[in-house]
């Protein structure tokens, strides 16, 4: 299990992981690593939350929120934000399915993708600032948001098909079973409940699950499946929805 965790940490983040810690794990077995997604999210959110706490006393909540969101993006190599932008460029192009997938593969940033990036990043900064002003625990909120968003991404993998013939998303999409999905969601729920005492965290997770499930169904209808880009979009939107639900 530890080898699987380190492999997933190296796969979906840019955090330095010694190669020997995940050596010997076949790429085809990576789908089993979905259950580690909430734990990886917890780690990323905790680091981002620590950045907020350190900077808040020095430069105030808005700038602390700005840098915590920046650090979170850098730790993932902007991988999920890129998926969000590509998904919006493709889906909102109002073209045929095949053309949408072509647009999503294009490395150039379009108007829809640019607007989505600005909106999501700015919204995260504003929501974190507002939560801080209301006295909410930012470290716990960010840790829970990142854990839940990565856990609920399993909803776009279970019983979904991969929309392309090849790509990194094919490692997970359609490859995880019901037990893995339940364990992943269960871990995310436990983290949310423990970090945000009472039902506040669990309620926010329920809202996030509903939003991501609906997103998955809409993308399935539009693209006839999911891609690595749509998973990234789900994670980014999941973080935002969870934080909004805490307000």
UniProtKB/Swiss-Prot annotation:
**Out of the domains of life, which is the source?**
Bacteria
- Molecular-function GO terms, alphabetical: adenosylcobinamide-GDP ribazoletransferase activity; cobalamin 5'-phosphate synthase activity
The UniProt record lists the EC number as 2.7.8.26
Q: Which keywords does the record carry?
A: Cell inner membrane, Cell membrane, Cobalamin biosynthesis, Magnesium, Membrane, Transferase, Transmembrane, Transmembrane helix
Keyword DNA repair present in the record's keywords: the answer is no
Compartments where found: Cell inner membrane
Main enzyme class: transferase
Q: What is this protein called?
A: Adenosylcobinamide-GDP ribazoletransferase
- What species is given as this protein's source? Shigella flexneri serotype 5b (strain 8401)
